[in-house]
Amino acid sequence: MHTMHIPSGDVLIPKPKLITEETDPLHIIKTRQKTHGRPVTIAGPMVRYSKLPFRQLCREYNVDIVYSPMILAREYVRNEHARISDLSTNNEDTPLIVQVGVNNVADLLKFVEMVAPYCDGIGINCGCPIKEQIREGIGCALIYNSDLLCSMVHAVKDKYGDKLRIETKIRIHEALDETVELCRKLCDAGVDWITIHGRTRRTRSSQPANLDAIKYIIENISDKNVPVIANGDCFKLSDLERITKYTGAHGVMAVRGLLSNPALFAGYTTCPWGCIEKFCYWALEFGGLPFQLAQHHLYCMLENMELKKSLLKKMMNLKNYISLIDWFNKTFEFKRYGEDGFGMGVEIPYKANSCVQRSASVVERQE
């Protein structure tokens, strides 16, 4: 597998990628319940972290659709370095939704033209609550500017039709009828599906997502026949059924839950060891992932597995991929790609000389 970086400079931009039933995110969203007996599962956009190696990992564990991190359109269309660093993909990275932060039609259309050959859909970020983004008219600012948001959706659908899917990921308003009105306008503008994060602009992630709000919105736009995905507080497989049955959503988008346990949609209650081996392999195989980002991914997964804190600290003190792999080899039965059992482990495979560490870890869990 080779990664594909988006071309830079004055080059001929290919036509949009050909959508098939197997890669069409809208078709998957509408039919997953019938074909797989479950709602659709989606790995949402994660700032810096939903890069190619992690997307590949999520796909291994029953994730149907995966998003890129948010990419700022104004930087991407004007800056060659942004195009090199912001998006890498390959032929197996599908269905892929590229999320964009944008505040005008011109930048959006140019951005879509550049990324459409490499993805299956575009997601407009209307949910980021960061003040700097809101000041730029990006993210959450767009749910208060429905005319601009709908004009951007309409412009993309007018140019590409069903050759490219477009989604909006929104937060809810304090007054839910405002969100209903926004969603109805988006449906009329041609949006293919809407993802609703069940929190307002000011709601902290520590507060529960408002599933009643998502349910209310879905009930009041049901005549539009546009699928809705619920986002917020999905941390285990049972949450998928619980959230969709309660709200009426077609599926669930998980973010924080997948960051710590990429296998949650496969029914694992904690991150299996196989995720560690696979992620390390893909991070090195694909290249381009800064070491500190890989380190953070591994920290989240190993913390979820309740690895001893002293070992987590040792890992976080490492400075490069070479020392990281050496540490894994010395501390665990760490399998490489091609070896029997690679990526199949569940429990942490401490080496025999690490039995003291293992015992200490068990005691620490009990405490």
From Swiss-Prot:
Biological process (GO), any one: mRNA processing
Required cofactor names: FMN
EC numbers on record: 1.3.1.90, 1.3.1.-
Record's keyword terms, sorted: Flavoprotein, FMN, mRNA processing, NAD, NADP, Oxidoreductase, tRNA processing
Catalysed reactions, as listed in the record: 5,6-dihydrouridine(20a) in tRNA + NADP(+) = uridine(20a) in tRNA + NADPH + H(+); 5,6-dihydrouridine(20a) in tRNA + NAD(+) = uridine(20a) in tRNA + NADH + H(+); 5,6-dihydrouridine(20b) in tRNA + NAD(+) = uridine(20b) in tRNA + NADH + H(+); 5,6-dihydrouridine(20b) in tRNA + NADP(+) = uridine(20b) in tRNA + NADPH + H(+)
Entries under Pfam families matching the protein: Dus
Active site annotation, chain numbering: C128
MF (Gene Ontology): flavin adenine dinucleotide binding; mRNA dihydrouridine synthase activity; tRNA dihydrouridine synthase activity; tRNA-dihydrouridine20a synthase activity; tRNA-dihydrouridine20b synthase activity
Binding site for FMN: P45, M46, V47, Q99, K169, H197, N231, G232, D233, V255, R256
Function: Catalyzes the synthesis of dihydrouridine, a modified base found in the D-loop of most tRNAs. Specifically modifies U20a and U20b in cytoplasmic tRNAs. Also able to mediate dihydrouridylation of some mRNAs, thereby affecting their translation.
PANTHER family the record matches: TRNA-DIHYDROURIDINE SYNTHASE, TRNA-DIHYDROURIDINE(20A_20B) SYNTHASE [NAD(P)+]-LIKE
Protein family (similarity comment): Belongs to the Dus family. Dus4 subfamily.
Listed name of the protein: tRNA-dihydrouridine(20a/20b) synthase [NAD(P)+]
Source organism per UniProt: Saccharomyces cerevisiae (strain ATCC 204508 / S288c)
Gene designation per UniProt: DUS4
